[in-house]
Amino acid sequence: MKKLIYYFGSNGSDGNASMKDILGNKGAGLAEMSNLKLPIPDGFTITTELCNYFYTHDNSFPKNFRNELRTAVEKLEATTGKVFGSTKNPLLLSVRSGSIVSMPGMMDTILNLGMNDEVCAALGEVCKDKRFALDSYKRFLEMYGATVLSIPSDLFEQIYERHKIQADIYRDSDVTPQLLEKIIEDFKKLHVKYAEKLITDPYEQLESAIKAVLNSWMSNRAVIYRKINNISESSGTAINIQSMVFGNLSKTSATGVIFTRSPSTGEKKLFGEFLINAQGEDIVSGTRTPLPIISDDSNSMKATMPKVFDELSKISETLEKHYLDMQDIEFTIENSKLYILQTRTAKRTAIAAIKIAVQMVEEKLISKEQALMRIDPESLNQLLHTRIDYSKGLTSIADGLPASPGAATGIIVFSPYDAEKLSHHHKVILVRHDTSPEDINGMHVSSGILTIRGGMTSHAAVVARGMGKPCVCGTNNLVIDEKKQTLIAGDLILKQDDIITIDGGTGKVFLGAVPLIQPTFSEESKLILEWADETSKLKIRTNAETVSDALVSVKFGAKGIGLCRSEHMFFDKNKIPLVREMIIAPDIDRRKLAVQKLLPLQTQDFKALFRVMGDKPVNIRLLDPPLHEFLPTTEEDKKNLASSLNLPLSMINQRLHAMHEVNPMLGHRGCRLGICSPEIYQMQVEAIFTAIFELHKEENIECKLELMIPLISNVNEIKKLKGDIYEMIHELEERYEHKFSFSLGTMIELPRAALNSKKIAEEVDYFSFGTNDLTQTTYGISRDDIASFLPYYLEERIFESDPFTTLDEEGVGELIEIAIKRGKSSNPSLKLGACGEHAGHPASIEFFHKMNLDYVSCSPYRIPIARIAAAQAKIKHG
C-alpha cells in the first residue's frame, strides 16, 4: 500500500502544491503554505488512496491504517504540546474533506473532535473560560451527530431554541454556561437515541469521522454537484486533519474568508468578511451575517484589528504572487494570532475571471495563453446576464447583499423540491433562510436565489456564483413564515407563486417583473475574445436564418453563417399558407403558381440576411425537413387551405392522409424532396441568386455564398441535384448578364454518406457535418425521444453523457474521421465544417480541432463560448 499520510505544519511539509492528485486541493495548498513558512495549524493529510481503497473494499480501512493514524496523531501531539483526549492540556482536531477539484460545501466537516465531558472540563480550565469550552462541546455534538450519526440537524436546532425560549433568551451570545450544560445533556440523549451509546473515546470519534467524510464523497448532494460541474467520481477525496484553533475563544478571536480580488467583478482589491468570536462554519453556513474586512464601517477588520489586517494583507499578496492566480483564503484568529486554514484558487464569475486574466497579463504575471486557459468557456453564459433598468424609477421592497451578478424574475418557491417541480413550467426564485448543500438541485433549476441570512461568502453566494445565477443574500428586512409559506416585506405579504425580481449586482429585491436591459461585453471581454481569435485555428460561425439572429451573431464575433436553415423562413405567417398550397396543390401547374408566389418573399429574406453578413460567408441549406411539418393540423387551418385552393375539405383531408409517413425523419425529406419536387429547390436557388445579384447591383455588396444539399446518402443524388442547380444558375447568369461565384457542398449526416465520402467529395467543394442527425442515425435513437430513458442510462453509466450534447467520439467521431480521410483523398482542397448542436460544446470543439476542421457553426449565444474553446483546443494540441 502506498504512503497514506503526509504531514504539514510549522516544521515544513512532506508534500507540495503539485500533489493535488493524492493530497487533494486543500491538502496540497496546506503543504505548500507550510513550505512558504506561513502560519497554519499543524496537521496531516490522508491521501485520496484511502478513499479509493475504502470504496473498493466494502467501506473498510487498510490493515495498518489505524496504526499509521495513531502515529500521525502522536506526531501532532509532539509539535503542539497538547495531548489527544488529555484531561490536562487537550488536543482537539478538525476533520475536513479535500477533493482534487474544489466542491464548496458539498462534503462534510467536523470541528472540535476529541471532546467529551472530561476534555470539556479540562479545556475550560486551560482557557479560563468555561462558557467557551461548553460552547465548543455543544458545537461538536451537533456537528458530529449530524455528520457521523445522521441525526437531522433541525432536531438539534429545536432543542437549542426550546431552551432559549424557556430561559427568555433571544441572542446566542446571552446563553449562559448553566443553560449550555442543559442543552449539552439533551444533545447527548439524542446521540444515545440514534447511536445507542455516547461515543466518548477520541480515537473512536476520529475513525468514525474519517468514515463519515469518505461516505460524503458519494452523498446525493456531492454526486449532483459533480454531475453539474463535470467532475470525475474516480478521483476520490483526501482528508485533512488539523489541530483546532479557536475563533470563538474571545473578543480578540475571529474567523473569516478573504479573496485577493473581487470574485464578482475582478476588481484588484482585497474583499472578504469575518465574524468575531465565531468558528469557520458560522461564516460559510450563512447562519450569521458577517462584517466586512475592508470598508468605511467602524466594525471592519481594518478598523478593529489593524495589526492582524496588515499581516493578512501581506499573506494574501504572497499567496496570489506564488500561485499566480486569485486566491480564496480561510483564516482564524485566536487571541489576536492569525492562522491560515486554507488557500485555493477562488471561484469567480465569468466577468471577474476575464478581468483578472487580462489584469494579470498586463501585470506580466501570466501569458495570453495562460489567461485564455483560465477561462471556463461555459461560464461565458454569464456575460449574457440581463440587468435591471433603473431609469424607470423603481422602488425595491428589500435590500440585501449583491452575492452573484445578474437579474432574474420568477415565481417565489420556498423549497428545493418545489423549485424542481415548478421549474418545468415557470422561472422560479428559490427563497430560503439560508441554503445548504442539500439544496443543490433546487438551486440548479432556479433562475435566481434569495436568502434572508448569510453574506458574500455564504454557501448560497459561492454556489450561485459558480453556477452563474443571480443571488441576493442577507436580506434582513425580509421574514419567511415557514408555517404559512409566506415572505413578509414590511406590510407586504407574498406567497408561493407570487412574482419577484432580484438583482444580484445591487442586492435589491422588487415586487413583480421589472424592465431589464440586455448585457454588453466589457472591454476586457472584447480583448480576451480577440486573443482567442488570434490563437485559434477553427473559425467560429453561427446557425442563423433571421436578421435578428444574424445581427446578434455578428455582435458576438461570428465569422459567417455556417448553417442557414432555409425552411425556417417558411414558417412566417405570410408564407406558411403559400407553402401549404405548394405542398397540397393537386397538379403541377397549381404547385408552380404557389412556388412563384413564394419566390419574391424568399428573395427578400435572403437579401436581408446577406445584407447583414456583408462579405462574410453564408452557408444556405436547401429545404430539409419532411413536408408534414408545414401541413395544417387544426380544423380552422385545414378549412382556410381548402378555401385558398378552392377545393373541398374532403380532398384536403385525403391529401393529408396520403402524405402521412410512419417515420418522416427518415422519409421524404432533404435531397429526396429536391429530386421528387424539383420546383421547390429551383425556386430557392432562383431566390438566393436573385438576392445576390440585386445586392451587387444596388448596394455593391459582394456576397460569399455556400449552397448546401441536405441528407445525401448516395453520390447519384448529389450528381442529379448538382446538374439541376447548375442548369438553373446558368439560366440566371444569362438573364442577369452576371457571372456568379459560389461553393457547393453537402451535409454529412448519414453513416452511408460518411462511408461513401470519397465519391461524394469529388462532386462538392465542402462537407458540413450535421452531427444531430448523424448521432440519431448512428445510434438509432431519436433526439426527441431520448429523454424517456437517458436519465436511467446515465445513472447506470451505460452512457457517460448525453450523446446529443457531447459528441460520441468512438462512434460518431470515427465516422467523421473516416469521412474526412476518404473525402480528402479524392478532393485535397475539400473544406470542412460542423453545424450540429455539438459545435457549441467545448469538448466537441476540441475534437473538431483535432480533426482539422476549418470551422464550426453554433447558435448565436454559444459563439463566445466556442471562440474561447477553439483557442484552448489550439493551445492544448497545437
Curated annotation (Swiss-Prot):
Catalytic activity: pyruvate + phosphate + ATP = phosphoenolpyruvate + AMP + diphosphate + H(+)
Superkingdom, natural source: Bacteria
Region Linker 1, residue ranges: 348-404
Residue numbers binding substrate: 565, 621, 749, 770-773
PROSITE patterns reported for this sequence: PEP_ENZYMES_2, PEP_ENZYMES_PHOS_SITE
The protein, known as: Pyruvate, phosphate dikinase
Positions annotated to bind Mg(2+): 749, 773
Activity modulation comment: Activated by light-induced dephosphorylation. Inhibited by dark-induced phosphorylation. Both reactions are catalyzed by PDRP1.
Its biological purpose: Catalyzes the reversible phosphorylation of pyruvate and phosphate.
UniProt-annotated stretches for the region C-terminal: 538-878
Family membership: Belongs to the PEP-utilizing enzyme family.
Matching NCBIfam families: PRK05878.1, pyru_phos_dikin
Ranges where the record places region Central: 405-502
Note: The reaction takes place in three steps, each mediated by a carrier histidine residue located on the surface of the central domain. The two first partial reactions are catalyzed at an active site located on the N-terminal domain, and the third partial reaction is catalyzed at an active site located on the C-terminal domain. For catalytic turnover, the central domain swivels from the concave surface of the N-terminal domain to that of the C-terminal domain.
Pfam families: PEP-utilizers (PF00391), PEP-utilizers_C (PF02896), PPDK_N (PF01326)
Region (Linker 2): 503-537
Amino acids binding ATP: 96
Location of the active site: 459, 835
EC number: 2.7.9.1
PANTHER family: PHOSPHOENOLPYRUVATE DIKINASE-RELATED, PYRUVATE, PHOSPHATE DIKINASE 1, CHLOROPLASTIC
